[in-house]
């Protein structure tokens, strides 16, 4: 295997330097060339080492042995006794020995810093550390394995070897007595009645209190000026509900730790769409301005078709549509019913220009990075599950079917619908390609995420509980694509890069379905509604059985051969189809590619499957200030492969995501990056290109001069290489 980015030699002179230089100063040297004009990767290795010597070791509580430590952590209510009671003490100690025998070392200073500031168990006063990474990994494994010793051992191997990384809420909370939920992303529908609105605000409070980010659907709310009790011009539209939600998230701020996070989605053909977008304008009136809620817009195919022909675009009264069709506005296919609704005199309409709509969208994205975009028809064509997908989540990668709830006057449930929770974790593509057993790595990840679903019980929001219990939905993500491609001498977005992405996701999909089918066979059950899905009919498998999927380039064929990873054949898919049709799959949804933030640094990965934003990334980390992070596997000899996202451009990013999208049942967080010379026309071109390529959702729009959240993207030395 090629050397990692941290394999640069540490010389005697750097050892002398380390005795008198603190870890923060050493890390900062990443942003300075050495005398030969090289990036000083060795200084970051030293910084990580010094972080332990100067800080971690001095602030870690000492125990004489494992028994003393475990007894203390249980007795003092740090660890959940119920988790450990599922195993013998000897097994728990053997698992810890297994983890420590791996001799794990953080590859970067930022990875170590992130772990100790954000994840590890600390004393109740927050001043001292009670765990090392090995302890955290074992507690995650013991929690998720729920008494299965074999699975616990496999989980320790997969996590500590860096192949599988649970998402933040799972990695942070598992096994702790004082903890949040292991899942932290939720989607709710709001229906067009006061009971649903009130209950949704309460649900947002409950979920935010538990550390959750919540996305809510506003498309069904009657528009501004619609009738209430047959009296015209009474409705206030969606803006006051957005204000209520913004205040709710601000109030439920997780014990003051951080602001609650919320997003709202509205359909492009809802009459309030311009009002909705105007809430994010910098010069918006304070009465309507929305500062902290994220915005998403749902755009159907018809909107693009109208813009292509430079035609008018009609917005339809959501109030009238629900009365004519007897289903909520969001459950109607606007593309399918557009001309029918246009001709229906019972439905009020507002006329705008389709191209003007896209222009306003691009202007706002330039100004604020919002809104997210969901391509409604693309999403629903690819959906193998019965029902309609109406909106996405805070990171635009969760795409699941939801159903409305009905409420009594006292806000109790007359009928509990299905809302959505996201159980996430990601594979490190580079480490997974290096796995001694690719199929096992994928299966263990699926079993871990299924355990998160099985162990999550959000009883305060019955529709979330119902959705989780019925669907067992999970979202296996991926990260470190750019890092892996660069390590192997492939440019991101090149023919070989896109070819690898296609075959990798194709192969993962096969093993994901096989794992979920195995769980269904073991448990003798499958997700609710399986029999009405494209999995049960076999239709889902047609594209894999009717054509051959194999590498188009010699390089990618060679990578899979050297890794001894067998690429599934048409016959493999035929056998899998027979198994699934006969026995089902346990999980309604299986894959979703989130943006991956902090866990990427701990795992030393490039974020998600998008390109790096900088060769050496600058982050602002609380009181410590600027911290520098080198791209994985980068050395002074392979810098040419580390073009940043702004240099690569939107087409290659979209091509890469399109290759992955065709094998992912949910979505992928796709941020578009533009140089500061870009215009709104460039943004519109990118949106059209994404739509044509079958992309499902778009996340943020980033201009080079805009800072990524929590970072500074500026002209640092390493960016100019």
Curated annotation (Swiss-Prot):
Self-association state and partner proteins as the record states: Tetramer of two alpha and two beta subunits.
EC number from the UniProt entry: 1.17.4.1
MF term (GO), any: ATP binding
GO CC term (a single one): ribonucleoside-diphosphate reductase complex
Residue sites binding substrate per the record: 168, 184-185, 213, 393-397, 595-599
One Pfam family named in its UniProt record: RNR_N
Site feature location: Important for hydrogen atom transfer: 185, 422
Keyword hit for Chaperone: no
Catalytic activity reported: a 2'-deoxyribonucleoside 5'-diphosphate + [thioredoxin]-disulfide + H2O = a ribonucleoside 5'-diphosphate + [thioredoxin]-dithiol
Gene3D superfamilies per the UniProt record, alphabetical: 1.10.1650.20, 3.20.70.20
Paired cysteines (S-S): 185-422
Protein name (record): Ribonucleoside-diphosphate reductase subunit alpha
Gene name of this polypeptide: nrdE
UniProt-annotated site: Allosteric effector binding, residues: 192, 222
Lineage: Bacteria, Bacillati, Actinomycetota, Actinomycetes, Mycobacteriales
Documented activity regulation: Under complex allosteric control mediated by deoxynucleoside triphosphates and ATP binding. The type of nucleotide bound at the specificity site determines substrate preference. It seems probable that ATP makes the enzyme reduce CDP and UDP, dGTP favors ADP reduction and dTTP favors GDP reduction.
Record GO biological process: deoxyribonucleotide biosynthetic process
Residues at the site labelled Interacts with thioredoxin/glutaredoxin: 716, 719
Residues annotated as catalytic: 393, 395, 397
Keyword annotations from UniProtKB, A to Z: Allosteric enzyme, ATP-binding, Deoxyribonucleotide synthesis, Disulfide bond, Nucleotide-binding, Oxidoreductase
